[in-house]
Structures are given as C-alpha cells and as structure tokens.
C-alpha cells in the first residue's frame, strides 16, 4: 500500500466482441469499476487513484459508451455487457476480481456475479436499481431520461442539462459538463442504456449471487434509494450502508466518501494480500 495516489493510465484492450477502453491506477488485487448510463470511466476519475492506493483499480468504458466500441444496437443487454466485461478480464489474464458498479454498472455487476460466480469474489453495488416484473411492465415503451433527439439549434444540449440538473448538486456545472460530454459520446445509447436496464430480468438473477455483497445507498438519490432494501433482501447475506447527501452522481460528487465506503467493504470481503501488491494490471 502506498500513501501516494498512483497515476491513472489509459489504454485500449482488444477483445473478441469489441475494443474496450480502460483506465487503471495502482497495483495489487484487481477491482473492476462499472459506470452508470450514459457515463464512462470518467465517472471514477477521482475514485480510481484512491482505490489504486490499495488495489489494482480498473475502470472500463462499457461497450458503446466512452471510447469503447459499440455492439450492434439490437445486441445491447445487461447480459451482453456482462459478457463483454468478462472478455476484458480474459484479455487481461484476470481469473477472479471484485466488482464495483454504480446504477447501470451495478446491474452489470449483478449479472456478472450471477453468471460466473467462480470469477467474482465480492461486489459493491452503488445505488443499484431493482428491476422486477412490475417495473419491466411499467416502463415498457415509455420515455426515459436522457431521451433528447438532436436538433439543429442545439436545443438537445439544454434538454439533457435540464433533465439531469434536479439530480445534481445545486449550482453545479462541472459534474453536469462531464455528464454532457459522455451523453453526447454515447449517442442513442444515452437513452437506450436506461431501456436496457428496464428490460433486465434482475429479480431472477439476484438470488443467484453468492459472493459477499455491500449495497451502498445514496440517500439523496430518489430513484435508487427507495429500492435499496429490496436489493439487499434478495441477496443472501448482503449488507447495506446509507450515505447521507449522496445523489445520482455519487462517485464523482463525493469521490472520497465513495472510495472510503468501497475500501471499508473490500478490506473484509476482498482483503489486500502481500503477494499481490506488485501485480500490475
């Protein structure tokens, strides 16, 4: 463990389905960080060095977001995104990892733990959605946030800003600027990513998760906070911690608190091992 924050390094990894962009920091046991829709690794820009003091932290751009290649539009699903994450782990030679996911990233983390339990040692779910039959039915065919068709006068930029502004700290511009950049890069997936989550049969997958799980509930997130207890109740042995003041952009809104919360969980569920401390990602 180092007291100095490690530098962030970025690169592309070729995998069977897509060329995937990652950002890494630190050395040691690998921890994969998965972002929300329509963000990118940048959501963890200030988290990576903090986790990288103790672990080999990897933030990937989910396929179709950030700088990662996209799948064909019809292929997009939580299951496909999970499979692409495993492709990345295979390419990096990582047989087992811990996973941290926020919003959409939490849904992908759940699928990874359910699909390949032998490869997932621990999972931290930050503001996870809870998708059951009722939610799938309620959202089918309905408009979603970040649905802002392009207009010649640039009105879609203001529409995106105004849709997201209520869920960000009052007076913020920096976090919203970062969101806008990622939303524009994602193109149609900025909205489709939310539909992908709403189609996911999460309720059938949660009981299959067997590794240690910590649900981190941002208390000022009006979408995820009310259902945090349902996620915890559906996973045997899962625990819950609530974060006062945490909002939808929790990882980049409160990076120090986010990292400390994740590290406190990993210290018990996925402890640092001396023989892994010099392992580079």
Stretches with model-predicted labels:
Residues 222-227:
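Conserved alpha/beta-hydrolase "acid-adjacent" motif
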Residues 16-69:
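Conserved HGGG/HGGXW glycine-rich cap/lid loop of the alpha/beta-hydrolase fold
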Residues 209, 215-217:
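Short beta-strand/loop motif that positions the catalytic acidic residue
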């Amino acid at each position: 463990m180092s007291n100095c924050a490690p530098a962030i390094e970025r690169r592309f990894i070729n995998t069977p389905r897509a060329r995937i962009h990652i950002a890494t920091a630190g050395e040691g046991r690998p921890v994969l960080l998965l972002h929300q829709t329509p963000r990118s690794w940048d959501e963890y820009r200030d988290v990576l060095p903090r986790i990288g003091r103790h672990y080999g932290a990897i933030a990937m751009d989910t396929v179709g977001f950030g700088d990662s290649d996209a799948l064909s539009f019809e292929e997009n699903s939580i299951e496909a995104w999970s499979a692409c994450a495993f492709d990345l782990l295979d390419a990096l030679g990582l047989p087992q990892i811990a996973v941290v996911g926020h919003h959409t990233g939490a849904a992908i983390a759940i699928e990874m733990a359910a699909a390949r339990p032998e490869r997932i040692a621990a999972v931290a779910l930050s503001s996870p959605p809870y998708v059951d039959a009722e939610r799938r039915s309620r959202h089918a065919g309905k408009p979603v946030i970040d649905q802002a068709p392009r207009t010649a006068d640039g009105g879609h930029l203001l529409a995106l800003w105004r849709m997201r502004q209520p869920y960000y700290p009052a007076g913020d511009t920096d976090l919203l600027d970062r969101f806008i950049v990622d939303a524009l890069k994602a193109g149609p997936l900025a909205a489709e990513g939310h539909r992908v989550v709403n189609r996911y049969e999460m309720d059938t997958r949660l009981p299959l998760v067997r590794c240690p799980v910590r649900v981190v509930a941002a208390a000022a997130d009006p979408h995820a906070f009310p259902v945090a207890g349902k996620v915890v109740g559906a996973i045997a042995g899962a625990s819950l911690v609530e974060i006062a003041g945490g909002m939808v952009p929790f990882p980049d809104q409160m990076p120090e608190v986010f990292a400390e919360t994740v590290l406190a969980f990993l210290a018990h569920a996925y402890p640092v091992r001396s023989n892994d401390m010099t392992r580079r990602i």
